[in-house]
């Protein structure tokens, strides 16, 4: 079994960490924690592809992230939808920005969170220097990204694009219950057994 669990700085390489990584993979569990980076996206993509190639049983992904690189989030979002094995998302801590983009890559019935999870949605931000032409190009790309993300979250939550745009014009925080009411979360769970009880609902959904 390949080893994937390691910190971004490669500071921790120990038999214990290797063993923990292998146990998580055997349990078909993927953890996304911290900033969404290209490196994290590459590691997570490798995990997803390896697990799906091995078995089509459900994969459980825990997301606890402050957000980060949108395109890195896109990579994981698309890979979750690409693989055959269904993925169940569990939000914990906070699920913000690009982390929320990853979280909504599965149908609502496979989106769970723990009771104290908080969610943050907002419009993408960017800064550009250089010539006026470069700044104009960057601004237009940000607008296209905003429209694309609004569509993704509208589809995922059932809210209108206009509502998403209005709500996320500034930082839009939701606690677990508010996230359920908004359509972002399917179910709040407190015990692992509640997720185990959902295994029978782990199949692919044609409505995503």
Show where each model-derived region lies:
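N-terminal organellar transit peptides
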Residues: 1-98, 104-208
């Amino acid at each position: 079994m390949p080893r994937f669990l390691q910190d971004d700085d490669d500071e921790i390489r120990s038999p214990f960490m290797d063993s923990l990584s292998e146990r998580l993979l055997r349990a078909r569990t993927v953890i996304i924690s911290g900033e969404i980076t290209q490196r994290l996206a590459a590691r997570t993509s490798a995990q997803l592809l390896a697990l799906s190639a091995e078995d089509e049983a459900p994969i459980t992904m825990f997301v606890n992230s402050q957000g980060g690189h949108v395109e890195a989030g896109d990579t994981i979002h698309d890979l979750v939808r690409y693989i055959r094995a269904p993925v169940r998302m569990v939000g914990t801590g906070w699920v913000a920005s690009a982390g929320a983009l990853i979280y909504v890559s599965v149908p609502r019935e496979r989106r769970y969170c723990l009771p104290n999870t908080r969610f943050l949605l907002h419009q993408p931000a960017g800064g550009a220097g250089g010539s006026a032409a470069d700044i104009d190009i960057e601004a237009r790309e940000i607008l296209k990204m905003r429209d694309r993300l609004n569509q993704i979250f509208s589809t995922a939550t059932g809210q209108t694009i206009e509502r998403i745009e209005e709500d996320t014009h500034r930082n839009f925080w939701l606690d677990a219950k508010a996230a359920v009411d908004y359509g972002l979360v399917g179910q709040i769970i407190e015990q692992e057994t509640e997720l185990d009880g959902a295994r029978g609902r782990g199949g692919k959904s044609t409505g995503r």
